[in-house]
Structures are given as C-alpha cells and as structure tokens.
C-alpha cells in the first residue's frame, strides 16, 4: 500500500493497551519508524526481552471504525442498486457486499492472521526455500501481531528484478 504511517505515540498506545504492559516491559528495542505501513496497520521492528528480533504489526487505532463505516456505505449502495436494477438483484450484489464485509472483518482480527501464518508455516516446513515466520502467541492480540523477524523483499521488487541474489526462474520452479 502507498499509505502514510500513523504516529508512533498512537502505535505505542495500541501496543500497550493490547499487551497490558508498557513497550519497555516487553521489548528492549522498538523502532519508532515503521518499516511498512498499509491501510489497516503498520509494522515495527523490535527486539523482545528474550533477545529475539521480531516484527510487530500494529493495527491503526481507527481501522475498525473506518472499515465498519465503509462497509455500511457499500451495503447501502448495493441494496439501492438491487432495488433499481434487476441484473444487479439477480447478481446478488448485496449478498456479495455482506460476504466482503465478513472477509474484511477477519482481516481486522490479527488472531486470524496469526492462525493462518502458523498453518502456512506448518504446511511449508519441509521446504528449505520457504520461510514463514514464527508467531509469538504470548504477544499477539486482535490488534497486535508479533512474529519472528524475517528479511525479505516486496513482491513488486522481485518482479522488477531489483533484488540482488534472487533467481526468479529457480524460485518459480521450486513453487510449482
């Protein structure tokens, strides 16, 4: 996403509220500048008191409210469209909007993402070329996700060929 990050103090508030502890009690290091920002949250690099380097995904403070408002607007437009268009009524666009809302609400629950990450990690464990981060469940909540820090590259960087040392043909062959 091309989204501006939200201020560190807001990230701190979310983390401390969710973990029921100060950042300093949980982490020995916590980067104030996010390494990535998206529409629903941002990621900070940190180090746990136990020494592990981690990625801390923090949900935007207003994410749930904004998503709910947007979903209500989408559903209202879909229902209105169905009222005036037989084709859209037959396409069941309001039902689609409701399902889309369910999917998007799941995106707001970082427990769901953590569970899916664990499932993927388990499924790909036998492949040397695949790395899926370990989830630190003790520090994961609905709005904060803490995982092992993994170096990586954005998919768009890979497809542009701007990442050194990556053989895309070999990677594609390994995948499938």
Segments from the language model and where they lie:
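Broad phosphate/nucleotide-binding scaffolds in NTP-utilizing and phosphate-metabolizing enzymes
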Residues: 1-176
